[in-house]
Amino acid sequence: MSTTREKLLATTTKFVSAFGSFDIEEMLNIRTPTCLYHQCCPSFDKNVVTNEETRASFPQFIATFKRFDFSILEPDHTLVDEAARKVMIRAKTSAESIVGAYENEYIFILKMTDDCRLIEEIHEFYDTIRLKDLQHRLEANRISFGDAAPF
């Protein structure tokens, strides 16, 4: 039988795989139906996103990126709080957008269900300067960035 730590890390691995998959069903299947996604970057006026909002904005994500690679940076620095059922990872993306290369770094805090198999809450922190650069490049090409972009 797996330990709590092993279960938390297994779900985290599924999250990372799903995030880079370009498959909305895979992304949502590891979340509870009531999962809340906190985008913790107030300069973008994004606060809390539901699964339904993620699904609705996903076509814009697919239209913006041709390739989206997502992985954990420094896996040895992953923090696991078994009692709180939380995992914190530092991650990176390397992507090819319709307006050129895009790279960013993130901190994710994932809160899991009691059985550690699903994610019930996500907190995401990212480099807003890099995202603003992408936004400006999209706008310069008259491509709508949108308020509900899931990135």
UniProtKB/Swiss-Prot annotation:
> What InterPro entries has UniProt attached to this entry?
Fungal_Meroterpenoid_Isomerase, NTF2-like_dom_sf
Superkingdom, taxonomy of origin: Eukaryota
Q: Which GO terms describe its biological process?
A: terpenoid biosynthetic process
> Coiled-coil stretches, from where to where?
none
Q: In which pathway does it act?
A: Secondary metabolite biosynthesis; terpenoid biosynthesis
Task: Show the PANTHER family listed in the entry.
Answer: AUSTINOID BIOSYNTHESIS CLUSTERS PROTEIN F-RELATED, AUSTINOL SYNTHESIS PROTEIN F-RELATED
Oligomer and partners: Homodimer.
Main function: Part of the gene cluster B that mediates the biosynthesis of the fungal meroterpenoid acetoxydehydroaustin. The first step of the pathway is the synthesis of 3,5-dimethylorsellinic acid by the polyketide synthase ausA. 3,5-dimethylorsellinic acid is then prenylated by the polyprenyl transferase ausN. Further epoxidation by the FAD-dependent monooxygenase ausM and cyclization by the probable terpene cyclase ausL lead to the formation of protoaustinoid A.
Q: Which family does it belong to?
A: Belongs to the trt14 isomerase family.
Look up the further comments and give them: In A.calidoustus, the austinoid gene cluster lies on a contiguous DNA region, while clusters from E.nidulans and P.brasilianum are split in their respective genomes. Genetic rearrangements provoked variability among the clusters and E.nidulans produces the least number of austionoid derivatives with the end products austinol and dehydroaustinol, while P.brasilianum can produce until acetoxydehydroaustin, and A.calidoustus produces the highest number of identified derivatives.
The protein here is known as Austinoid biosynthesis clusters protein F
Q: Which organism is it from?
A: Penicillium brasilianum
- Gene (name only): ausF
